Amino acid sequence: MPYILLDCDKFIPERMKHTYVYDPEENILPACNTNTVPGDMTERGCAFAGSRGVVGGPIKDAIHMVHGPIGCAYYTWGTRRALSDNEFHRRYCFCTDMQESDIVYGGEKTLEKASLEVMEEFPEASGTFIYTTCPTALIGDNVDAIARNIEKATKKPAIAINSPGFCGVSQSKGHHVFNMTFYKWLKLKRKEFPEKCMPEEEKTPYDVALIGDYNMDWDVAVIKPLLEKIGCRYVTTFTGNASLDELFQLMDVKLNIVHCQRSAEYIAQMINDGFDIPYTRATFFGLSDIAESLYDVAKALDLPKERVDQVIKEEMEAIQPKLDYYKSKLEGKTCMVYVGGPRTWHWIKAMKDLGVEYVAACCTFSHTDDYEKMNKNFKEAGIKDILVIDAPNEPELEEAVKTLDPDFMLVGLKERYLFRKYGVPTINSHSYEEGPYAGYRGFVNFARDVYKAVCHPVWNVLKEGEDKFKNFKGDLNE
């Protein structure tokens, strides 16, 4: 089926290239990762949010300094539930709080003073990440020089991340910038501090690192035991609940396992190119994808398949009774998904595992390869006629909900409030309701939260209330 133009987009015909209905007989990929059309009420985030809010922020023992107005610090605290076991991580927000005078006269002195004060207040911090924002990048503050000054004064690492909000079309650019900057910095510092690298005598043929997991509601605490059960030695995570020192060992493992394939595959590719360490892609959401990922890891490390079979059997036996109950309640329900990038296609087989029908997939910052994977998963799951929208705006989302009338939606942090007003149950599949959602036990948590949202009696009350006002609404329309 060709691309389609939604009714709400008649004044922005360019949006037609971003919207299609999946058909296995057609090879359609939408326009994506492009500049937002003026007048389009986009839901995208900025590049700064991608670097600070997504990839960098979960590093648990470093100071994350936002060099910009206090409004930019919204993305630093109380948004994504990237949890850690560090006492000050996520409890504090560090920002230079740029004022008009700083914009006029420059903010470098303000940045250096604030960073040194924070390091004095928190001597346990391992180092400092400094993130530029739109105003500080536009006035040309030399944050790289300030980072060098801070490093010299504190004798601890200071890393400048130059990803102001305007430097890319979406938060995806911020992911890329952080990956590249951190890789270059780490490669240099490993030579400077060889004692932080893993000693040769400690290395094993089964060392792995998890790339692109940010420990939402302790996902890492579920994934790590799974990998260890099949025979891996878990070394570190990029970046969920990881310390700066632990990340020095990213280049010492035998295999990198890439979970979020949009925000962190960049660094896995660079490590592969620079250190000849292979990587494999994995999805730890949904029964089918978890099993496939475990087999892929075992194959890459030459681990016995029988061990993986046994682990899967044990995990399934532990969750089957609860899973059967939730599946019986959700069978035949319809779901619309609106998330950032990879999770749009991560959830395809997971929905099928629950007996849920997937009716629409909307992505904020997906690239071409994300849509290729999405179409592949649709085909493997045997489903078609799915509405797909790249970087949807608010009217498009409203029209999709009104047209498709899904039983529930998987959404992110900010969209759920709009759709709940429409009477559509929502589940936060971005930062979770009550996770973890990864792994077998996490999938039961996910099924439980979907069940609690969809089957909550409040929706019946709302529908009864709507029925009472039908005649009244009809009179008004006439």
UniProtKB/Swiss-Prot annotation:
Cofactor or coenzyme needed: [8Fe-7S] cluster; [7Fe-Mo-9S-C-homocitryl] cluster
PROSITE patterns in the record: NITROGENASE_1_1, NITROGENASE_1_2
Cross-referenced InterPro entries: Nase/OxRdtase_comp1, Nase_comp1_asu, Nase_comp1_CS
Keyword list, A-Z: ATP-binding, Iron, Iron-sulfur, Metal-binding, Molybdenum, Nitrogen fixation, Nucleotide-binding, Oxidoreductase
One GO term of the biological process aspect: nitrogen fixation
Reactions listed under catalytic activity: N2 + 8 reduced [2Fe-2S]-[ferredoxin] + 16 ATP + 16 H2O = H2 + 8 oxidized [2Fe-2S]-[ferredoxin] + 2 NH4(+) + 16 ADP + 16 phosphate + 6 H(+)
One Pfam family this sequence matches: Oxidored_nitro
Annotated EC: 1.18.6.1
GO molecular function: ATP binding; iron-sulfur cluster binding; metal ion binding; nitrogenase activity
Cofactor: binding details: Binds 1 [8Fe-7S] cluster per heterodimer. Binds 1 [7Fe-Mo-9S-C-homocitryl] cluster per subunit.
Residues that bind [7Fe-Mo-9S-C-homocitryl] cluster: C260, H430
Binding-site list for [8Fe-7S] cluster: C46, C72, C134
Family: Belongs to the NifD/NifK/NifE/NifN family.
Cited function: This molybdenum-iron protein is part of the nitrogenase complex that catalyzes the key enzymatic reactions in nitrogen fixation.
Quaternary structure annotation from Swiss-Prot or TrEMBL: Tetramer of two alpha and two beta chains. Forms complex with the iron protein (nitrogenase component 2).
The protein's name: Nitrogenase molybdenum-iron protein alpha chain
Organism the protein comes from: Methanothermococcus thermolithotrophicus (Methanococcus thermolithotrophicus)
Lineage, uppermost ranks: Archaea, Methanobacteriati, Methanobacteriota, Methanomada group, Methanococci
Gene that produces this protein: nifD
